[in-house]
Design a protein with these regions (language model features):
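A short, acidic, amphipathic alpha-helical segment used as a generic capping/interface helix at domain edges
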Residues: 44-47, 66-71, 101, 154-166, ...
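Functional cores that coordinate and move charged inorganic groups
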Residues: 10-12, 16, 22-96
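Structural motif
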Residues: 56-61, 83-85, 115-118, 176-178, ...
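C-terminal structural cap/anchor segments
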Residues: 162-226
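Conserved, well-ordered active-site substructure
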Residues: 220-279
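Acidic, glycine-rich loop-and-beta core segments that form the ion-binding/anion-interacting portion
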Residues: 76-148
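Short, small-residue-biased leader/transition segments that mark boundaries at the very start
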Residues: 2-4
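Residue-level preference for the first positions of well-ordered beta-strands
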Residues: 51-55, 77-79, 110-112, 169-173, ...
Length: 290
């Protein structure tokens, strides 16, 4: 269905809602450099000569390819930005001829999904996974927002419970959403004087500390992290500075590896608001089949 982004689930994101359907309007909030919007460039069409930021619309891969060829006709553009679909066209546009086939490594068949996203698309994926056998744990407001919780006695007890869950079920979910909505967490944050940014950072940091405690657990298998904040805080909390992309397992779902305390681990990452309903099930099946 066609829907402008400001009216989509991305428009009601509590942390970073998309308020504009036009990229030029979004750019205008962040810079005084003039931005201009143009339709797709066709074969042989001249590139507009305006000074500033030129935004080209596209409704298909063919549109992206057509605009890309027009932009590259007279040499490589100095500076570009675009979506992942456009990035996939760059090797041909830049005449990068080398092709390598990457084989997905054998992964631990046990899968832990850690979700810090509030996007409705992801929540539906979690529901479908739970309905098909995933164990699902929702962190409490205290677990998400109390600094030092995972070092406390209650935190240590909770970690023992998580390890037991991981050992008992090869497919598990740990998420930060309250059942039926996130009002309990919002109330808990308000009582402690946390604004929206404090709430966001606090939750992501708590997930990072929790995973830091789990990284050495023999019950932990392959990790799947949803949401950029979740990934960033997890890496920061355990001191990991570098992720090496390995391959794309599905569209927009990337397998990467990192080294932690001399041990190589794999992590699957995806955007919170991305993917079809059965994505988690299909990924779990694919890992188990390798």
């Amino acid at each position: 269905d066609v829907c402008s982004s400001d009216l989509s689930p991305f428009g009601i994101d509590p942390f970073e809602p998309v308020r504009h359907a036009r990229v030029t309007e979004l750019i205008g909030e962040q810079t005084d450099v003039p931005a201009y919007s143009f339709p797709t460039l066709k074969e042989g069409e001249a590139v507009p000569e305006q000074e500033g930021i030129l935004v080209f619309d596209a409704g298909s891969l063919d549109d992206l390819a057509s605009t890309g060829r027009a932009l590259f006709r007279n040499g490589r553009p100095r500076l570009m930005a675009g979506c992942a679909g456009f990035a996939a066209l760059l090797p041909d546009l830049m005449k990068m001829t080398e092709r390598r086939t990457v084989t997905m490594p054998k992964l631990d068949h046990r899968l832990l999904v850690v979700c810090g996203s509030v996007n409705s698309i992801t929540l539906r994926q979690l529901d479908v996974a739970e309905q098909n056998g995933f164990s699902r744990l929702r962190l409490t407001p205290r677990q998400k927002l109390d600094p030092g919780y995972w070092e406390s006695e209650n935190g240590k007890e909770a970690l023992r419970g998580i390890n037991e869950m991981l050992a008992a079920n090869p497919r598990c979910i740990i998420e930060t959403n309250d059942e039926g909505g996130n009002q309990p967490t919002a109330d808990y944050a308000a009582a402690r004087g946390l604004d929206l940014e404090g709430l966001r950072v606090g939750i992501a940091s708590s997930i990072g500390h929790m995973l830091g405690k789990l990284f050495t657990s023999p019950a932990l298998g392959t990790l799947l992290l949803t949401g950029g904040d979740t990934l960033l805080q997890c890496m920061n909390c355990v001191g990991i500075k570098e992720l090496e992309p390995v391959c794309e397992m599905e569209k927009g779902v990337v397998l990467a590896r990192f080294t932690y305390r001399g041990c190589t681990r794999y992590v699957i990452t995806k955007s919170g608001g991305f993917g079809y309903e059965k994505l988690l099930l299909d990924l779990a099946d694919r890992i188990a089949a390798k």
